[in-house]
A protein has these predicted regions:
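Bacterial N-terminal signal peptides that target proteins for export
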Residues: 1-8
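Mid-length scaffold segments of soluble, non-membrane domains
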Residues: 77-152
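Alpha-helical scaffold segments that form or flank carboxylate-/histidine-based iron centers
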Residues: 36, 66-73, 96-104
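Signal peptide-directed extracytoplasmic domains
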Residues: 53, 57-87, 112
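Bacterial Sec signal peptide processing site at the extreme N-terminus
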Residues: 19-36
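A structured, mid-to-C-terminal "fold-capping" secondary-structure block
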Residues: 34, 129-219
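Post-signal-peptide N-terminal segment of Sec-exported extracytoplasmic proteins
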Residues: 32-67
Length: 219
């Protein structure tokens, strides 16, 4: 039972991260396969309603706020190396330098404690932003199973961002085990962080698909 639950939560992280880390702002979307996207979206909402949301309710009940906040800081800290590289590729060298310093100092506590005192919630640049800065079009809008809303460019950006995960760069033999533990926790932590916002969109929208798509392109 525990293995099955972990598998469900590992898959669910992709649904949540794609909703919480949207970086591009567009007013319209090219959605050439909307019927397919809507079918996948319905599946994702079913998964969220009957697996992730109930698990998150338990997580919020038993997890103290200070631990939730520490986990959020840790997961944001893990994005700093990739953010530094992407800022450099975009010509934002001062921002890149600050991210390197932030990551280095906070590494003393693995990001769980904000030693630098800076706002850890400020999103780091990602490869989707970098590709945008080089004039690469987003391509078609896609809704992926578990991964949620994205674009063709966003898929490529996500894959590139994954190569800069500090756990992958460390090259340890226990990376798979660490990730298997980290991913379900990240899924619950992120779903808890945006719990009310996601539920508001999901349960109070006439056309949830269109609303989630609009949010993706406007955030």
């Amino acid at each position: 039972m525990k293995i099955k639950l972990n598998t469900v939560l590992i898959l669910s992280i992709f649904l949540i991260t794609s909703c919480s880390n949207v970086s591009q702002k567009h007013t319209s979307a090219w959605d050439p396969i909307e019927p397919v996207n809507r079918a996948v979206f319905s599946f994702n909402m079913f998964f969220d309603t009957y697996a992730l949301e109930p698990s998150t309710k338990v997580y919020r009940y038993i997890m103290p706020d200070f631990i939730e906040n520490a986990l959020t800081r840790h997961f944001n800290w893990l994005k700093k190396p990739g953010g530094a590289l992407n800022s450099s590729l975009q010509g934002k060298f001062e921002e890149a330098f600050n991210l390197v310093i932030n990551f280095s100092i906070n590494s003393l506590a693995l990001g769980f404690i904000n030693i630098t005192g800076e706002n850890q919630d400020i999103p780091s640049s990602d490869f989707d932003q970098t590709l945008t800065s080089y004039g690469i079009n987003p391509g078609p809008y896609l809704v992926l199973p578990f991964a949620g809303p994205t674009t063709l460019r966003g898929v490529g950006g996500t894959l590139l961002d994954g190569t800069l995960d500090p756990l992958n760069l460390a090259g340890t033999s226990n990376v798979a085990k660490v990730k298997a533990t980290e991913l379900p926790i990240k899924a619950l932590n992120t779903r808890a962080k945006y719990f009310d916002e996601i539920n508001e969109l999901k349960y109070n929208s006439i056309d949830a698909y269109s609303v989630f798509k609009s949010v993706y392109f406007q955030r």
